[in-house]
Design a protein with these regions (language model features):
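Terminus-proximal functional modules
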Residues: 1-62
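Cell-envelope and extracellular/periplasmic
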Residues: 59-332
Length: 332
């Protein structure tokens, strides 16, 4: 056969290898040779593809230095996942980015642009362009200027680390092979409903970086709904899949008792404002789009137990409204 792409699959056991190969076969790959045990705990299987595939392919540049990702095929349409809230929902991870391995981008995972370049000093982009997603997404607060002290910027280890890329990677096996994930980052560290500065909003650039106040028709909300609609308008086949929301700590110092009502009003307004695009929402209506509300860390939970129960407790028991709380840890 005429091989266009090569890659390898690593696994910890025969069953793990079989599961991973099943996914690869669906993506257009074929086994190339037999599996090899490279350590007592690691199996490796070479794979190859004659045509386009839907996963990233590692290739060496002609000078033999470094590793880059070869684009294969752009998705025909996207499942849109909106990321919103405060620091827990964005790139506040202080660890060293690993863009060649663990934080490796995937050509099926994109994001809506906000900054003027895809990466610091990189390719130019405009607000709401579709660009590759990596470990440091284009949120309201720009974290790309903060680098780990041991970062090698020549390897793309710029900025801080978020979980958006990894949420999308978890979803890829469950969507059609010709589809991708389009992330819409709208997070701002330190933001709240009951305290903080409104900031400003522009259709041309979104919410200003000093915007730290959520609520109906606040600049952060306008950024959220505006970018969500922009993502859907990119392609009539795009589908709004979910809103991943993580927010609450900064309301501990505001008026915690008012948080639940303001959050609920914002969800209702978001869904009402999407009524004209219901056909592009999962389930055929804006009410069908789940809000996935993440927990806070143990530190905040322990330090502010009463306020925690008021704010984060309000996310619980709302499944009938398609609002789902995901605990950071299981209560004993």
């Amino acid at each position: 056969m005429s091989i266009k792409h090569y890659d390898v699959v690593r696994a910890a056991s025969p069953s793990d290898l079989a599961e991973k190969l099943t996914h690869k076969l669906k993506e257009g790959w074929q086994p190339f040779g037999s599996p090899v045990a490279i350590t007592p705990y690691t199996l490796m299987q070479a794979i190859a593809a004659e045509g386009d595939v839907t996963t990233p392919v590692l290739v060496k540049p002609s000078d033999g230095e470094g590793t880059v990702i070869s684009a294969t095929r752009d998705p025909e349409y996207y499942f849109v996942v909106v990321l919103a809230g405060q620091s827990n929902s964005m790139a506040y991870g202080e660890g060293l980015p690993l863009p060649e391995t663990y934080d490796r981008p995937d050509p099926r995972i994109k994001q809506l642009a906000r900054r003027s370049t895809v990466t610091p000093g990189g390719v130019a982009c405009k607000y709401n362009d579709i660009i590759p997603a990596d470990h440091c997404l284009h949120d309201v607060q720009d974290m790309s200027r903060l680098n780990h002290p041991k970062a090698d910027l020549s390897k793309g280890q710029y900025g801080t680390v978020g979980q958006g890329l990894h949420i999308a990677k978890k979803l890829l096996p469950f969507i059609p092979a010709n589809a991708g994930i389009l992330l819409v980052p709208c997070c701002r560290g330190g933001s709240a409903f009951t305290t903080g500065a409104d900031g400003t909003y522009s259709d041309a650039s979104g919410a200003s970086e000093n915007s730290t106040r959520w609520g109906v028709d606040k600049p952060l909300y306008k950024d959220l709904i505006g970018r969500t609609k922009a993502a859907l308008k990119k392609n009539p086949k795009n589908v709004l899949f979910a809103v991943v929301w993580m927010q609450g700590e900064f309301d501990f110092g505001g008026t915690p008792a008012n948080h639940a009502a303001q959050f609920g009003a914002q969800v209702d307004k978001f869904r009402a404002d999407l009524a004209d695009m219901a056909g592009q929402c999962v389930g055929g209506s804006a009410d069908g789009v789940p809000w996935i509300c993440g927990d806070t860390t143990y530190f905040w939970k322990q330090k502010n137990e009463s306020s925690y129960q008021t704010v984060y407790g309000s996310y619980k028991n709302k499944t009938e409204k398609n609002i789902h709380f995901v605990p950071f840890m299981t209560d004993e």
